[in-house]
Amino acid sequence: MTTCVWCGRMVTPTVTLATLWHWQPLSTPAVCAACQNRLQPLHAPQCPRCARQQTTTQVCHDCVRWGDAWVNHAIFPYDAVLKAYMQQYKFQGDYRLRVVMQPYIRRALARETYDVLVPIPVTAGTWLTRGFNQVTGWLTDQPFQQVLTVDDAHKPRPQSSKTRQERLRSPQPFQLAPAAEKILPNQHVLLLDDVYTTGRTLRHAAAQIYLGGAKAVTSLTLAR
Amino acid sequence: MDKSQLFGRRLPLDQAPPEGHGIPALRQVNGRWQCQRCQQWIGVNDYLPHRIPYCRHCLNLGRLTSHTKLYTIPEPNQFATLTHSPLTWQGQLSPQQRIAAQAVLRLTQAGRNQLLWAVTGAGKTEIGFPALAWALQRGWRVAWTSPRVDVCLELAPRLARAFAVPQAVLYGDQPRPYTYCPLTICTTHQLLRFEAAFDWVIVDEVDAFPLATSPLLQLAVRRAQKPTGSHLYLTATPGQDLQRQIRRHQLAVTYLPLRHHGYLLPPLRVKLVANWQSQLDQQRLPGNLLRQVRQYQQTGQRYLLFVPHVKDLARVQQALRRAGIEGGVTVHAADPQRQAKVQAFRERRVSGLVTTTILERGVTFPAVCVLILGGDDLVFSTAALVQIAGRVGRQRDHPGGDVICYATSQTRTIQRAQAMINALNRRGRRLGGRCP
């Protein structure tokens, strides 16, 4: 008998004839069915650029204002359920909750075409307090390259505490790691981040990666 | 930081304070990690990268890892002993209440662990007042806690009016920061932040969720109390465990089997119904339940109908509508209009309320009858059933009313609930209680 990592309720493994026939240990899901049902993935119609959930399939207002052809894919809408999840996982630092999203990230990455996977890094200060990078926590065994670095001086306070205008004005926080020049040239890079809010962070990261010689950059985020 | 913040507490700090004793927040015992705040074992998968363990049990109070340190300064009781009683409460206790209050005061003075077993609607809070006044006058540090935050929120202004001492109110998202006070009102979760701090701990609704089923919180209550301290449990429905302690004389007990108006508790009647669950699946309700509700409709009697689960609410309402009974509303814990609906029922704007166990305790409606659908469901514990029965007849003008439980069988929980009500009524009759 195990409990759901998210809500703590009991989870009982489903026993079917097939599981009995294979005579393998019963695999209990880490997340209960109720929590699984609360997570509702994004569905059509979406903005073709940033994957925002909307009523039409036209390019959304924010993407028009950006004026570029950035393509972002996302898995979930950033609704109350995802906010609660991010609150517990990222801000309270419950690293165990990474297993909730691992299957979703695995399936989403399998659908993407890319050469190099680059997760958005966290600052050294965040590493000290949080103790983990929330993005790489979702990766199970997918290879990734940490070609970006970020320092605390550029992030005096977290993005999530700023207004939209402040976020859009924020300066470039990323640098290329020394190893980048060997990895990036002529590669299709996929950036992985937790939430796409204004798109500012991802575009900052992409600008640096293009400088490193990549031929294309797209992104995947857990939530939009 | 003011050092009084650490008196009798157990706080994780980034920097070591000038005074105080620090211990690692997580300790390794025989290869397993144990959290020093909540005393729970760390799960085998609860690690950060680089194999740093962290505690998921008390995560809500701020994450503790093996790198965190907890600081404490032993409780010094820096309160002046008062020359006169801090009790400013002007109310009058009934003769029965006064006898109970005297008994509680005597046991407190003797430093005994005790239980005040008073029926629902007996006025437990006020019975504790004389003993609390005595303790505060002696310069004791006292915590008045409850597992339920709404109890704490309701209690804090009452205690502020009744006692002229500074008080700190602590709960999940409290607006005011912690201060060192002789009287602390908090949820039982907040007690995890204290260590050997209180001379006297009062636990209100000791049998309520989640304290009754949580070893973590039960330990928190014991650890927040000083080794020389004592505790007072307040409840109308002590669980099996507390009743065992009473039988073994490990816990002193004061009974108050009569309500403030002097009438006995209405008995719990059981009516057997065949398979109410499958009837509900077909959007039907047991015939005798429907007849009862119809009768209430004709006489204008208001009723509470308790159902086991949130998902039953809509089905029961549809079944009632199909049977031609209108005027009922449903309410559950996550209902955004919960307060408004309960208020509408209180003001007699609706005739019936279909509810889950959220209204089992802490609410008073004048002149209601109570129906319980599926009293054999696991949700209805003995304590829940007695509490639900206690919603009836709380007022002097309407001391009686029906409490009818519809169940497929007489389960042990139902029998225990009936036995508890009967035992309290036997004691009450000896004290001159009248049948309503």
Model region roles, listed by residue range:
Chain B
Residues 205-208, 342, 346-351, 355-399, ...:
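Conserved RecA-like helicase motor core of SF1/SF2 enzymes
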Residues 159-194, 341:
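Inter-Walker segment of RecA-like/P-loop motor cores
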Residues 196-272:
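Post-DEXD/H (motif II) to motif III coupling segment of the RecA-like Helicase ATP-binding lobe
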Residues 27-80:
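Interdomain "pre-motor" coupling segment immediately N-terminal to P-loop NTPase/helicase cores
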Residues 226-241, 389-420:
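Conserved segment of the helicase C-terminal RecA-like domain
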Residues 153, 168-179, 328-356:
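Conserved helicase ATPase core of P-loop NTP-dependent helicases/translocases
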Residues 117-125, 135, 140-155, 282-286, ...:
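Conserved strand-helix element at the start of the C-terminal RecA-like helicase core
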Residues 89-112:
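N-terminal pre-P-loop "Q-motif" helix
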